[in-house]
Amino acid sequence: MIQFTKMHGLGNDFMVVDGITQNVFFSPEQIRRLADRNFGVGFDQLLLVEPPYDPDLDFHYRIFNADGGEVENCGNGARCFARFVRNKGLTNKNKIRVSTSAGKMTLRLERDGTVTVNMGVPVLEPSQIPFKAKKAEKTYLLQTPQQTFLCGAASMGNPHCVLDVEDVANANVAEIGALLTKHERFPRGVNVGFMQVVNAGHIKLRVYERGAAETLACGTGACAAVVVGQIQGKLDQQVQVDLPGGSLTINWEGEGKPLWMTGPAQHVYDGQIQL
């Protein structure tokens, strides 16, 4: 039997598994089965806590999408990861350092129950996103057989494409997201953000996630949207990001600096399941 915890960050939900005190391995097929909301646990991502590879760090953090594929980063998951390792007694620290397949992150448990995550420095160089473009630009033209889109692009350890929309509530997220997430100019696929700028300190955002379709919240997507919005001269240093599942606060001092994301992490229940 595998012990697990169900958690969510703004409705972006996770199955969190302690891979330190129990020996676990998940095949892509097992993950797909567990992710099924009718026949399994049901989640957007599975989060796996592993021992650190680096003695200066506290944990290694792995993320698997509902389709079974491993991904580089998940901001909402990082907040739940921090709350989980603390609640389970795997650490007594308030400041937790972890590695992911994309790099290192610092997670900070706040007194009010929220978690602040150092999301790292955004990557804007196209080849590193990865995105096929000759050089970094504030906006790019993305052509499809149906229409041409204006977008910004950035990586937060995972690739993001951000579109400006006038009214996010009526944006065609499912259709356009499905069209762009596999666009040939993003060799590893891309998460697609639909951003409505309310004012310089406030945006509304919906995200079509690579491998998971639209989710209620996407932490890296919120960060990427703020980066693109700032670069395009539309946003301030601190921005409230309203997602369908709730709000995050993103702080970015500009190019070369890390982003800080603050938001909630909720425990739903503990369970056990036979693989």
UniProtKB/Swiss-Prot annotation:
It comes from the Bacteria. SUPFAM superfamilies: Diaminopimelate epimerase-like. It catalyses: (2S,6S)-2,6-diaminopimelate = meso-2,6-diaminopimelate. Its EC number is 5.1.1.7. Coiled coil: none annotated. One of its GO terms (molecular function) is diaminopimelate epimerase activity. This is Diaminopimelate epimerase. It comes from Shewanella oneidensis (strain ATCC 700550 / JCM 31522 / CIP 106686 / LMG 19005 / NCIMB 14063 / MR-1).
